[in-house]
Amino acid sequence: MKYLKHILSILAFFTIDQFILEYIAVYVTTVFNGSITFMVLCLLLLQTFLISFIVLWMKKEIPLNLKFPKWKWFYLYFFLLVILLSILEAWVKNIFHNFIVLAPSVSNVKLPSSVYLKGAGISSILFFIYAIGTGPIKEEVIFRAYVMNAFFKNNKYHLDVLLSGLLFGVAHLVFRYRDPISFVIYFVYGLFFAGIYKKYKDIRLVILLHSFCNFYVYVKPIWIFIYNYIFWNFLV
């Protein structure tokens, strides 16, 4: 019965995150005749409230120690491992690119046409903030802090790590991809983050690693932008 309560809670959190928050953001944008930027900003604020609620829920429902251990400099080696994993991921996706299937990109709700007429604004920057900020925080709070403290906590067979990695892979399979290769990739990422969280009990570390992993995707376009800006403004 205890596990059932946690399972239903996790499903409820994902339902709220993937569907209800979007409806609320679109409704508020429509009422105030806002832009895409306004909608994405609303979504970020709503997700911040959801993360705060999840943390409060966890503190109430499970034994949870949110004290942060002292930062250790050898943690930096894990960031190098993230780079290696990202390079390996790119290599695998390049080899099997014909088998990578993205989930249908269909919005759950329709925005008024007037929203699009106002332009994108800074929505790209806000999506970037989501990718390296609220997204990793939300996923690590759920998949690491919640799942690993609610199910098989400190299991000597590392079932907590396996479950965390499995759910991380399944979530990306449901919401972003439709192929087994992507599932394996995110399952490995999930095991990596879960193993580090179990070893060091530092949610900050796995959030930063996850955030850095997502940021690494943007390194090339950011470098191209900086190079072009310097070239055309100072060298030509």
Which ranges hold each PLM region?
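Membrane-helix interfacial "entry" motifs
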Residues: 2, 32-36, 40, 66, ...
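Alpha-helical transmembrane segments
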Residues: 3-20, 77-82, 161-165
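Alpha-helical transmembrane segments in multi-pass membrane proteins
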Residues: 6-60
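Alpha-helical transmembrane segments of multipass membrane proteins
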Residues: 13-21, 46-51, 81-89, 93, ...
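Membrane-water interface at transmembrane helix exits
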Residues: 21, 25-29, 55-59, 63, ...
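Juxtamembrane helix-loop-helix connectors linking adjacent transmembrane helices
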Residues: 31-37, 62-135, 227-236
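Cytoplasmic juxtamembrane interface segments
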Residues: 51-72, 205
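Transmembrane helix-loop-helix hairpins at the membrane interface
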Residues: 121-236
